[in-house]
Design a protein with these regions (language model features):
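Extended, low-complexity, turn-rich repeat/linker tracts enriched in Gly/Pro/Ser/Thr and Asp/Glu
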Residues: 123-130, 158, 241-244
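Solvent-exposed strand-to-loop "edge" motifs in beta-rich extracellular domains
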Residues: 120-126, 155, 215
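Short carbohydrate-recognition loop motifs
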Residues: 45-69, 82, 90-100
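Extracellular beta-strand elements of beta-rich domains used
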Residues: 233, 251-255
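Extracellular/lumenal carbohydrate-interaction signature centered on repeated Trp-anchored short motifs
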Residues: 72-89, 98, 106-117, 201-204
Length: 267
């Protein structure tokens, strides 16, 4: 499995203290992704990156690729870190350290500055979702398999508890459905939200364009909060729980200050 890391050993490659003027759009660098595969870099499958497209092929595995976007490109991560070499989850202080580095250089992305996100994706087949969630929309243990998932992790304004919204492509769960996944570790309890952006096999093998209002959906899920800083964007294709193969391509992920005129707001 290929792991692409564009990093600086000390993790301090981005320079400049002057806050850049905010552009109307922020296209993500689609060539810089860090791997998380839940199998210590041994998850079966492969990734292909080129031409502003990343294609993830998961073979009975769960493959995730992520980056920390900033106003001037992905935040470099030190490739010598043990959890990076193991394709593991970020260690406990990573979020705080990454935020501090970006804030010192005034390059953090505020969700309210870029409320819209658009992207294109294509799948080669849907994944069985008959055992994904219960009737209340709670994702069942072993049910979190999706052919394509694009996730956004954010912090609430003035807070440090991570918020996550991910858009997924399902087989039969209706478009527009919001699912929730609950997880816990020691004294912490997490709730991750998945919103069905595409459903069904009609467009398998075809590129689909999506546009979402992050602020609007954040406020719908957390009505008493305001979104703060964008922390991480990830792509995930997985079939480990259902024992299936899944392939998805992702392209042209862009953050927008205003609703893109040439994109369908319902997509």
């Amino acid at each position: 499995m290929l792991l692409l890391l564009v990093v600086i050993a000390g993790g301090t490659a981005i320079a400049g203290s002057q806050a850049p003027e905010l552009p109307d759009t922020l296209p993500l660098d689609m060539s810089v992704w860090y791997r998380r595969d839940y199998a210590r870099c041994n998850g079966a499958g492969r990734v292909t990156i080129g031409g502003n497209i990343i294609t993830i092929e998961a073979d009975h595995s769960a493959l995730k690729y992520w980056q920390v976007p900033t106003l001037i490109g992905p935040l470099p991560i030190n490739e010598r870190l043990g959890w990076i070499r193991r394709c593991d989850r970020p260690h406990g202080s990573f979020g705080t350290e990454a935020r501090k580095r970006a804030e010192e250089q005034q390059i953090t992305i505020r969700v309210t500055d870029y409320p819209y996100i658009s992207w294109r994706w294509r799948i080669q087949g849907t994944v069985d979702d008959s055992r994904t969630a219960d009737r209340a929309g709670r994702i069942l243990s072993g049910g979190d398999d999706f052919a394509a998932k694009l996730g956004i992790q954010m912090l609430p304004e003035g807070g440090n508890d991570l918020r996550e919204i991910a858009y997924v492509w399902t087989r039969s769960i209706p478009e527009g459905t919001t699912l929730v996944q609950e997880a816990g570790a020691l004294f912490w309890h997490f709730r991750f939200y998945r919103i069905v952006a595409e459903s069904g096999d009609e467009y398998v093998g075809q590129w689909r364009t999506e546009t979402r209002n992050l602020v609007e959906e954040y406020k719908r899920i957390w009505p008493d909060e305001e979104p703060g800083v964008l922390m991480r964007i990830f792509l995930m294709t997985d079939g480990d729980n259902t024992g299936t193969k899944a392939t998805a391509s992702y392209a042209d992920i862009v953050l927008h200050r205003a609703l893109p005129e040439r994109l369908d707001p319902d997509r």
